[in-house]
A protein has these predicted regions:
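A broad "ordered helical/assembly scaffold" signature
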Residues: 1, 8-13, 23, 59-62, ...
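Predominantly flavin-linked oxidoreductase catalytic cores and closely associated redox partners
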Residues: 2-147, 204
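Short, surface-exposed, charge-dense and proline/glycine-enriched linear segments
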Residues: 24-26, 30, 36, 81-88, ...
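A residue-identity detector for tryptophan
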Residues: 29, 60, 105-107, 140, ...
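Generic alpha-helix signal with a bias toward terminal, lower-confidence helices
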Residues: 37, 60, 69-73, 118-120, ...
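Generic preference for well-ordered secondary structure
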Residues: 45, 92, 163-166, 188, ...
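FAD/FMN-dependent oxidoreductases across multiple families
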Residues: 96, 102-106, 112, 122-245
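C-terminal helical "tail/cap" subdomain of flavin- and related membrane-associated enzymes
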Residues: 210-371
Length: 371
């Protein structure tokens, strides 16, 4: 592959072998959709380290694994549960079931004749070596969720794979020289909320519009906005995964972050996309400016949630003396009130959570505080 020089307006030359013969040609555009092979990223040396240090291990087992059978409730108790009525009495195994813990989440998804199970984790909380094989992953699942031991170990394993670190970044997405990256050949954050589909659809929208732009000057003008927008869309996601992944282990903290992230998702991603505004010249200059501020705002909030999570893990301090049994009972049920001046003054303790730095081995120390 010989890429044309930027600004030359020339064509790209390509050559490849197929069926024992060499084929060559010229192209106006080159779009790398090679997935994790990342042909152009490696060729042009565009790779950049991601601050997200997460891994995954996943497998398929034969048959449908029914989570309702992994319970101590009898069939009548299962049938009469109030939440089943709210869900229309649909079998639980028909849904995607997620289980969350400190720095990880685990999925169970029914497929045709088989069940997909997988673990996504912060490397500061789970060691990939502990789940690197199908046997080790099954052992981990049964240890963390013991009722699965009644069924899962007897299932035939059909497929297994894993990634020690799956997040991807690069230095450039699209060029006026008429080449671009899409899909995992470009960037990837984390499977939580499945944002990969959002990045793919957004980047493909920008690349498609660029390909349809015939005038070189107009193309260069668009790319001056498209490139920072593509990076801002990626970087705004990063703090949600790199800073506070351990808050998945607390229902209250996760509920708070979920409401915030759902609001951001629809306001910044969904509504502009479904209204065809991403490539609207009157819209995207202001959109890029707003998006560039979202990343820092999200980072600050994720640090606050992390500090709150660490504070909640502190043991409850009982008063040295209590004037009455009523006040004793009241005090024992309450945690120490957090200072109301600044979030940075919240009491902290060591937590097994990555700070989002380039080193996955870094931990929050007792002296650290949110920024």
């Amino acid at each position: 592959m010989d890429l044309a020089e930027e600004g030359s307006g020339g064509l790209h030359d390509f050559r490849f072998e197929a069926g024992g013969r060499e084929i060559s040609g010229r192209a106006t555009w080159v779009v790398d959709a090679s997935g994790r092979g990342r042909f152009l990223v490696r060729r042009e040396k565009l790779d950049r380290p991601s601050p997200i240090r997460h891994g995954s291990s996943f497998l398929w087992v034969e048959g449908l694994l029914d989570p309702e059978k992994c319970t101590n409730l009898d069939r009548k108790q299962i049938r009469l549960r109030s939440e089943r009525s709210a869900l229309g009495h649909f079998p639980t195994f028909l849904a995607t079931n997620h289980y969350c813990g400190e720095g990880y989440w685990f999925w169970e998804i029914p497929l045709h004749g088989k069940t997909s199970l997988g673990l996504v984790f912060d490397s500061a909380n789970v060691n990939f070596k502990d789940v690197s094989s199908p046997e080790k992953l099954v052992e981990w699942i049964c240890r963390e969720y013991p009722l699965y031991a009644r069924d899962l170990p007897q299932r035939k394993i059909l497929y297994h794979s894993g990634l020690t670190s799956f997040a991807l970044d690069n230095g450039q997405t699209i060029s006026p020289a008429r080449w671009a990256l899409v899909g995992e050949a470009c960037r990837f954050t984390d499977p939580l909320y499945s944002p990969g589909g959002d990045l793919i659809s957004t980047y493909c929208t920008l690349v498609t519009d660029a390909i349809l732009t015939r005038d070189q000057k107009e193309l260069e003008t668009k790319i001056r906005f498209y490139e920072p927008l593509a990076r801002a869309i990626y970087e705004a996601y990063v703090p949600s995964f790199a800073v506070s992944y351990c808050t998945l282990g607390d229902q209250e903290c996760f509920s708070l972050r979920y409401v915030w992230e759902l609001t951001v998702y629809f306001s910044f991603y969904v509504f502009p996309f479904i209204n065809d505004l991403l490539t609207e010249p009157r819209f995207f200059p202001a959109y890029v400016r707003r998006f560039s501020r979202l990343g820092q705002l999200n980072r600050d909030l994720q640090h606050f949630l992390l500090a709150y999570y660490r504070w909640k893990k502190e043991p409850v301090q009982r008063p040295a003396s209590a004037p009455s049994s009523t006040s004793c009972r009241w005090a024992a049920c309450r945690r120490p009130r957090a200072p109301s001046t600044r979030s940075a003054s919240l009491p902290t303790r060591r937590a097994r959570c990555s700070t989002g730095s380039s080193s996955a081995s870094r931990r929050w120390r007792a002296s650290s505080s949110p920024t």
